[in-house]
């Protein structure tokens, strides 16, 4: 799920600091010497689109979609869905090209929420594209992920939007999990994450924006965090499961019979497949919510007719 291009001042980064970040001194501050491969593989829950993967495969060598979408690396899943060794090679070529072009800090491609999404996607899809790659590619990749994770630790609080902060922290959490961070370190990250979840959601589980697409994106982030935590043996059930279940109930409330969200507050652009696979991964089923008093929605049905009201 790709975040849309956003304009305006979304994070605090002064011009002088932007200049400093283009120096070798800043590059040195991010340097580390990670292992040539990730020490822990975090399984991926999401499917890509084979049709989009086919478009990437048949496009020119320098294929790009819009810059923000490309920088998030959702397209790696699309190539994986297309399948085959050629798609795997194409993914490596595009990843390596991005690393070569963005190895040094850039305000756009290194924006914390964009970077958090990218790091998470690189880690989640790692087991598909990386293990059979040449050793020099694997070493370059892990260095790049480690540098970005260190930068995320610095920059996530600079984002003004708290939902964007959660996406950035998700990338940091997934990245640290993949590098074998100790449980205490991961638990400390969860201590930062969980209060933010409460700050951006209402008592009934709805996102404060009341926008279904943003609500679903946050829910997917939380599922990914829970996935990464459980894969490292950290129990998040008491903290995350209740919130995810609440958010899923709101999602079911918004859906028409065809599976699409009611077109409230900019909704209707989310793929039905993304909605369905997200709800399928919740791991819980429940009755369709009839009213969400804090979020301000109500649903009622009679026979084959359903009315969903804002």
Q: Can you name each region flagged by the protein language model?
A:
Residues 44-45, 49, 134, 211, ...:
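Helix N-terminus capping/helix-initiation residues
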């Amino acid at each position: 799920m790709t975040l849309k291009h956003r304009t305006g001042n979304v994070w605090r980064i002064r011009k002088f600091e932007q200049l400093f970040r283009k120096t070798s001194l800043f590059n040195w501050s991010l340097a580390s010497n990670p292992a040539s491969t990730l020490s822990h593989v975090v399984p991926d829950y999401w499917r890509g689109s084979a049709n989009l993967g086919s478009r990437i495969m048949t496009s020119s060598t320098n294929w790009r979609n819009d810059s923000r979408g490309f920088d998030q690396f959702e397209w790696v899943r699309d190539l994986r869905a297309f399948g085959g060794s050629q798609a795997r090679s194409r993914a490596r070529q595009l990843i390596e090209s991005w690393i070569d072009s963005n190895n040094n800090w850039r305000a756009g491609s290194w924006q914390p929420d964009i970077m958090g999404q990218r790091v998470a996607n690189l880690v989640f899809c790692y087991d598909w594209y990386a293990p059979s790659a040449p050793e020099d590619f694997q070493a370059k990749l892990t260095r790049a992920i480690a540098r970005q994770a260190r930068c995320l630790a610095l920059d996530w609080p600079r984002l003004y939007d708290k939902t964007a902060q959660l996406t950035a922290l998700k990338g940091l959490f997934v990245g640290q999990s993949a590098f074998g961070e100790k449980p205490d370190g991961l638990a400390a990250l969860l201590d930062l994450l969980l209060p933010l979840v409460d700050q951006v959601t209402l008592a009934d589980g709805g996102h404060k924006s009341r926008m279904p697409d943003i609500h679903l994106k946050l829910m997917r982030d939380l599922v990914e965090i829970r996935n990464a935590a459980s894969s490292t043996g950290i129990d998040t059930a008491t903290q995350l499961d209740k919130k995810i279940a609440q958010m899923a109930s709101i999602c079911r409330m918004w859906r028409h019979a065809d599976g699409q969200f009611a077109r409230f507050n900019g909704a209707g652009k989310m793929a039905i497949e993304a909605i369905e696979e997200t709800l399928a991964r919740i791991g819980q089923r429940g009755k369709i919510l009839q009213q969400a008093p804090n979020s301000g929605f109500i649903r009622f049905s009679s026979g084959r007719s359903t009315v969903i009201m804002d």
